[in-house]
Amino acid sequence: YMHIVAMEGSGIKTVADLKGKRVSTGAPGSGTEVKGLRVLEAYGITPKDLKSQDRLGVTESAGALKDRKIDAFIWDGGLPTAAVLDIAVTPGVKINIIPHGDAAPKMVAKYGPLYFTAVIPKGTYLGMESDVSVAVATNLLVAHERMEEPLAYQITKLFLEHTADLVAVHKGAKEITLKSAVLGSSVPFHPGALRYYKEKGIKIPAS
């Protein structure tokens, strides 16, 4: 989930408000930076439009925001992200998660069917009083096209029917569901995976 995190009182309520602000766009060369710059681009914003562009990882970005060294930062990660949780519970600090879900169609038009719109539910972070629409890209489990169909079927089945084991390792895995598993793929589904989804009555999006 793409997060755009701003400090309450910074004057940042929309992506357009990032112009002229100090923004961390993610570590150099990271997925966060690539996706974050594409979100900004969808709104007609380039790094030159920012007062300053810091290129920090999420922990460093969170620290810089708390220290008022930046006005906002971009982060792409699961829900909830520990560093964002930490800021949200810091005494005297209130954050805003900036909506930008309407960037997804523009990103798809330019870069292909890698992105879609999803929601960070209210209450994910302290102070979030409503759902926030954001642009997201999925993580993919990729197999060679020559993998045997029964094996691909069993892998898909085991993965999706044992998500509780994954959640025990990483809370972000709670977002993995039958419906979410078929969203945002830019490559064809393996026949073995398709057989499992068909058994479960899950339709594959046209994209």
What does each of the following model-derived ranges do?
Residues L37-G44, K66, A72-I95, D102-T117:
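A ligand-binding cleft/hinge motif common to bilobed small-molecule-binding domains
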Residues Y1-D67, A164, K179, L183, ...:
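Bilobed "Venus flytrap"/periplasmic-binding protein-like clamshell domains
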Residues T59-E60, P80-A83, Y125-M128:
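Glycine-rich, charged/polar anion/phosphate-binding loops
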Residues S130-S207:
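Segments of small-molecule ligand-sensing domains
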